[in-house]
Design a protein with these regions (language model features):
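Conserved N-terminal helical subregion
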Residues: 2-3, 57-61, 70-147, 153-160
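Glycine-rich FAD cofactor-binding loop and adjacent beta-loop-alpha segment at the N-terminus
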Residues: 4-8, 12-75
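Hydrophobic "anchor" residues on beta-strands that sit immediately upstream
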Residues: 7, 30, 132-134, 267
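Conserved phosphate-binding and hydrolysis motifs of nucleotide-dependent enzymes
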Residues: 11-16, 139, 270, 283
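Conserved FAD-binding catalytic core of PHBH/FMO-like flavoproteins
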Residues: 59, 136-244, 251, 256
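FAD/FMN-dependent oxidoreductases across multiple families
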Residues: 209-308
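C-terminal helical "tail/cap" subdomain of flavin- and related membrane-associated enzymes
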Residues: 296-388
Length: 388
C-alpha cells in the first residue's frame, strides 16, 4: 500500500466500489475496505436492481455496465390498484429507450470488482487504514455509523419484503408489473432481455404472511404467486431460494463530521445514510447519486482544501438531503396510502389512479422524473469559492 491514503472507504458493495473508481480516476488514492469476505457461492444470488438513466450513464462512464443479458430494459410499466385503478407507462411515450433497466446484482458486482482490481489508485483491504477522509458505505446495518455515534432514525413499515426469481410461462415483453392489493405490494421485474421468461419478484406483505410464504413448498409458492398476479404471465416456476428483509424508512441525522483530535473527517453514503420503501425502485439509484455528488465535490474543491475539509462535506450533506427529500416523501406517502384499508380511502386512491392514467402530459413528466430526476444536482464542476 502507498504510504499515503487520501480516502478510506468502508464497505465494498456497489456503492463503495463505485465511489472508489470515481475518486481513483481523478488521482485520489483510495483504500477500499471489504470486511465481509468472498461470497460462498453455495446459493444463487437472486438480487436485482432497477437502475435509471443517470445510474446507467455513471456506470457506463466507469466501463462497468453489465452485458445486455444482465441489464434488461423496461419498455413498459403496468401498475394495478386494488379496485380497478390502473396506470400504464411506456418508454416510447416518454421518448426514451427505456424507463429503467433491471440489472442482475452479481453481474454488476463482477464488473465493478474487475475495474477495482485494475485501478492502480485503489487498494482492497481487509481492515481500515488511517486517512484524512473516511467514507462509510456499509449499508443500513452499518457498524461504523454506530461507532461514530450517529443516530439512525428508523420508522419501520408493517411489512416484510420477500424476494425470489421465477420462470414465467409467457414472455414478459420488457414490462415491469406492480400490483397493489389488500395483502400488500407485488412487483415483477423483467429479466433476460425483452423476450425473456424470468422475473425478479419483490412482494411486500405483513411479516406473518411473509413467513407463511417462505414456508410454502416451491410449487405451492409459485401457484400462490400466479394467483396474486392474476395469471399475467402464465404458469410460474420458482428458481432458487427466497429471501426476506424488514422494510423501513430511515435516515441518519448527520451525514458528515470530524473525529476530534485526529485530523480525520467522515461521511456517510448509500443505505448507511438513508433507506426508502422498495416500491419506488430507487434505492440503489439514490446511493449512486450520493457517491457521484461526493466524488464531484471532492475533486472540484480548490487545491488548497483537504479532502477532509468540512465545508466540502457539509455541502455534500446539504445537496443530498435536499435531493432525497422528494423521493423520500412521495414513496412514504404511497406506502402509507396503500396500507390503509378504509373503503373511502380505497375508492379515492383508485379513482386517483384512473384519473392520473388519463392525463398524458402529467404521466410523461412523472416518467421523466423517474428516469432523469430533476432534483439531481448538475454534475458540472464547481469552483472552490462555492463552498461555504
Amino acid at each position: 500500500m502507498a504510504q499515503h491514503t487520501d480516502v478510506c472507504i468502508r464497505g465494498a458493495g456497489i456503492v463503495g466500489r463505485t465511489l472508489a473508481l470515481l475518486l481513483a480516476r481523478e488521482g485520489v488514492k483510495v483504500a477500499l475496505v471489504d470486511a465481509s469476505g468472498a461470497p460462498s457461492g453455495e446459493h444463487r444470488d437472486i438480487r436485482a436492481y432497477a437502475l435509471n438513466a443517470n445510474s446507467r450513464a455513471l456506470l457506463e462512464a466507469l466501463r462497468c455496465w453489465p452485458q445486455a443479458e444482465h441489464a434488461t430494459p423496461v419498455l413498459r410499466m403496468e401498475v394495478q390498484g386494488d379496485d380497478g385503478g390502473d396506470v400504464h407507462f411506456d418508454a416510447a411515450s416518454a421518448h426514451a429507450p427505456a424507463l429503467a433497466w433491471i440489472v442482475d446484482v452479481p453481474a454488476l458486482e463482477t464488473r465493478l470488482a474487475e475495474a477495482v482490481r485494475y485501478q492502480p489508485h485503489v487498494e482492497l483491504m481487509s481492515e481500515s487504514v488511517a486517512a484524512p477522509l473516511l467514507v462509510v458505505c456499509e449499508g443500513r446495518s452499518s457498524r461504523t455509523r454506530a461507532e461514530l455515534g450517529v443516530h439512525y432514525d428508523v420508522s419501520p413499515y408493517p411489512q416484510t419484503a420477500l424476494a425470489a426469481r421465477v420462470h414465467t410461462g409467457m414472455p414478459h415483453g420488457g414490462t415491469a408489473r406492480q400490483w397493489f392489493s389488500a395483502e400488500g405490494i407485488l412487483a415483477f421485474l423483467p429479466l433476460g432481455g425483452a423476450n425473456g421468461q424470468e422475473v425478479a419478484v419483490v412482494w411486500s406483505v405483513a411479516p406473518e404472511r411473509a413467513q407463511a410464504l417462505m414456508e410454502l413448498e416451491p410449487p405451492e409458492f409459485a401457484s400462490t404467486l400466479a394467483q396474486a398476479s392474476g395469471g399475467a404471465l402464465g404458469a410460474l416456476h420458482l428458481q432458487g431460494e427466497r429471501c426476506t428483509w424488514p422494510l423501513q424508512l430511515a435516515r441518519a441525522d448527520r451525514w458528515c463530521g470530524a473525529l476530534a483530535g485526529t485530523g480525520t473527517s467522515w461521511a456517510l453514503a448509500g443505505d448507511a445514510a438513508h433507506t426508502v420503501h422498495p416500491l419506488s425502485g430507487q434505492g440503489l439509484n439514490l446511493g449512486l447519486a450520493d457517491v457521484q455528488a461526493l466524488a464531484r465535490l471532492l475533486t472540484a474543491r480548490s487545491s488548497w482544501r483537504s479532502v477532509a475539509d468540512m465545508r466540502v462535506l457539509r455541502r455534500y450533506e446539504r445537496e443530498r438531503k435536499t435531493a432525497l427529500l422528494p423521493m423520500r416523501l412521495s414513496t412514504d406517502l404511497l406506502a402509507q396510502l396503500f396500507a390503509r384499508r378504509e373503503p373511502g380511502v380505497q375508492a379515492l386512491r383508485n379513482w386517483g389512479m384512473q384519473g392520473f392514467d388519463q392525463i398524458g402530459p402529467l404521466k410523461r413528466w412523472v416518467a421523466q422524473q423517474a428516469m432523469h430526476p430533476a432534483f439531481l444536482i448538475d454534475p458540472a464542476p464547481i469552483s472552490g469559492r462555492d463552498f461555504s
